[in-house]
A protein has these predicted regions:
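N-terminal assembly/interaction segments in proteins that build large macromolecular machines
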Residues: 1-200
Length: 200
């Protein structure tokens, strides 16, 4: 594909990718939309690679959100590997978005990550759904799938990383975090959070 410097700049603005990556994607793609898809795929792979590295995530910040009426508050610890990233606007904006998500999501999340859920809780949840009369009416072949679907649906409400972002229902919080991981090149971990609601 033939492209101009304006095309490279536009692609950088849309994807947040580096100059060389944008130039390479435009060279390899037949259309502008295809270049965007190439960069998104590359970014997702990079985020997965960064997550799999065994670097300590002991830097970061603790941030809060208090609703203007004073009846709702959130405290969040968000970690990364270096203080350089912890001071970056992308990281601070992510922390802000996460506190707003925790405050505004209904139902409110209980766990930060799937790995935070105790095995006993999952076993209890599975037993509850298996005992459901609606599930028992289903043919034997599909019951396990129905139970797994119900568990997945409940976890998409109870686990912050699985929730749909309140500002864009096309992406999950996990994808939002992955996007910042891709931009910063560092693993980011939601360590813990607490949500306080007056009278709850």
């Amino acid at each position: 594909m033939d492209f101009t410097a304006k095309d490279v700049a536009k692609l950088r603005e849309i994807t947040g990718a580096g100059f060389a990556d944008c130039k390479s994607a435009l060279s390899d793609a037949k259309t502008f939309d295809e270049a965007i898809k190439l960069l998104e795929a590359k970014g997702q792979k990079r985020a997965e690679k960064v997550k799999s590295q065994d670097r300590a995530t002991s830097e970061g910040l603790i941030t809060s959100y208090i609703h203007h009426a004073g009846n709702l508050g959130v405290l969040l610890e968000l970690n990364c590997s270096t203080d350089f990233v912890a001071r970056s606007d992308e990281f601070k904006n992510l922390a802000r978005e996460l506190t707003l998500q925790i405050a505004g999501a209904h139902p409110a999340p209980i766990y930060a990550n799937l790995s935070d859920i105790p095995a006993e809780t999952l076993a209890t949840m599975r037993a509850e759904f298996e005992a459901d009369p609606e599930v028992k009416k289903r043919p034997e072949k599909v019951r396990a799938q129905v139970v797994e679907g119900k568990i997945k649906k409940r976890l998409s409400n109870e686990v912050l990383m699985e929730q749909v972002w309140i500002k864009d229902d096309k992406i999950t919080i996990g994808k939002l975090v992955d996007e910042v991981i891709r931009k910063t090149g560092e693993n980011i971990v939601i360590r813990r959070f607490a949500r306080f609601e007056l009278g709850a």
